Amino acid sequence: MSAIESVLHERRQFAPPAAVEKAAAISGMAAYRALAEEAERDYEGFWARLARETLEWRKPFGKVLDETNAPFYKWFEDGELNASYNCLDRHVAAGLGERVAVIFEADDGTVTRVTYADLLARVSRFANALKKRGVGRGDRVVIYIPMSVEGIVAMQACARIGATHSVVFGGFSSKSLHERIVDVGATALVTADEQMRGGKTLPLKSIADEALAMGGCDAVKTVVVYRRTGGNVDWHAGRDVWMHEMVANESDACEPEWVGAEHPLFILYTSGSTGKPKGVQHSTAGYLLWVAQTMKWTFDWKPDDVFWCTADIGWVTGHSYITYGPLAVGATQVVFEGVPTYPNAGRFWKMIGDHKVTVFYTAPTAIRSLIKAAEADDRVHPRSYDLSSLRIIGTVGEPINPEAWIWYHKNVGQARCPIVDTWWQTETGGHMITPLPGATPTVPGSCTLPLPGIMAAVVDETGQDVPNGQGGILVVKRPWPAMARTIWGDPERFKKSYFPEELGGRLYLAGDGTVRDKETGYFTIMGRIDDVLNVSGHRLGTMEIESALVSHELVAEAAVVGRPDDTTGEAVVAFVVLKRSRPEGEEAAALAKTLRDWVGKEIGPIAKPKDIRFGDNLPKTRSGKIMRRLLRSLAKGEAITQDTSTLENPAILEQLAEVR
């Protein structure tokens, strides 16, 4: 991997705005370096201090880190606490019960505000109801529910009684849901009659019934149904229960179950490169510490902020920066049921103005799709809305290409809001490498520097450090509290996937090709290792080619994959969405040549795509991620055999397959 070629030559740099720097928790690079040096000097002492300052413990911990069974690390093991107590009770006890915890905006625009006192009461009622159905400490509860206050309540209620939740995104198929219910050994399922997104309904209860009928789900004795739309559902008496009926007569008080620091808070499934999905298991204390700390550092959270993370609670971003991080610090946050393009592509910008959002966190895919819409229709351009409340904006989920970064900075951040381009993963629990809004000069396309206490590095295939400016593999050299503890039921897979013997067995393998800038040391993520192309012996990250394509004035979005080639070993195949209508015939051929030459000029002849296909869109999941594995099959001319249940736009596959 040391031969990966970094072809990003971004030199634009943006200093933190003076007003943000002056008021920031970490103000200036000297403050950042002081924290990083504290962690290097006394690693365990650094984390112990944060854990004592950030969390409220029922029983204080004595031992900080146990490395005796590496890589199955344990943090604060002899301490006891409760995540729900730290997210709710302590704020109410501090006199913040009337502070708004959640501003919920439904798909149709209806707005509901829930205070911390209200949320605590709702969580307690549901926790009591679950206990009466026999759910308790150590049980696993699968949650298959729309974006809703009820989803947050269900997660927090599980944490309150010591049950471990496993949230399944509301767009997954019955087969995918079944796999997760069986793998995790769930005893209860929480779902809804239907989901509302973009003016359309999805029958979640019917899908859940199909999953449970596939066999192997006998342990599921309770199915709780949240009535979202009032749609008709099949009913299994004795097993199924309406959420509103279940909690109607329950007490508003529920004593938290005090659990050990290492108690599994949740299991979240993430795709593996091969085989079945991996159930990533997270601890209670280490995870909660880090999502709270990164709210304070990355987002520079202040008590008067209105925070909005646009993710779904079915993904780790929604766990960390909706259900747990904001509530752990006592934040007011927006939670949104819908999609950014309904009823039009100005929805995000309108909501920022309506709710006076100060910190906004979304995905590059959403930004790119909204760029295309804004450039086609000024009515949905950010400049048509009041975004004056914003002070910090962020990105999550994938690297953001420099052109999209600049557009976001100029049009959404109005050239006055720092962008926190955050790199992290399901397995890391929270942010790992990111600018700090009041400290780090930002560079478009770079996630800049690791947070204090995160010992990230770039190494070759043998685990040896590579010089700055030379590409390699991103690793983390020391354990951190929020890291995943294991893969549920498969510790060997955990070791092989994340701590491979080829790297010595002690380095956390992130799986991303990365390069550090020669001068600044900034990290730039170049794409997954399996998204690295080997063309004529030259290794190129897909992000660089995509960035070059998107920098062309006609291109809105691009995704690049490889396919075997007899001459070059691997050929570059690009799928491109234009800012105008899709070309065909001779026009398409001429434009493909133009873009090939453009990439050759931007990067070099070696990176020229051999095949460019134009589509009206790219195949994406309902959470907005590009489904690159499908593009690889299309590029090779193979039939699509993979699970497409999470695909938002199935018709696009036929369109892209037709184009040659």
Swiss-Prot record:
| Record's comment on post-translational modification | Acetylated. Deacetylation by the SIR2-homolog deacetylase activates the enzyme.
Q: Which residues bind CoA?
A: R197, G198, G199, K200, T317, S536
> What's the short name of a Pfam family annotated to this entry?
AMP-binding_C
Gene Ontology BP term (one): acetyl-CoA biosynthetic process from acetate
Reactions catalysed according to its record? acetate + ATP + CoA = acetyl-CoA + AMP + diphosphate
Q: What does this protein do?
A: Catalyzes the conversion of acetate into acetyl-CoA (AcCoA), an essential intermediate at the junction of anabolic and catabolic pathways. AcsA undergoes a two-step reaction. In the first half reaction, AcsA combines acetate with ATP to form acetyl-adenylate (AcAMP) intermediate. In the second half reaction, it can then transfer the acetyl group from AcAMP to the sulfhydryl group of CoA, forming the product AcCoA.
Family the entry assigns = Belongs to the ATP-dependent AMP-binding enzyme family.
The protein here is known as Acetyl-coenzyme A synthetase
Q: Which gene encodes it?
A: acsA
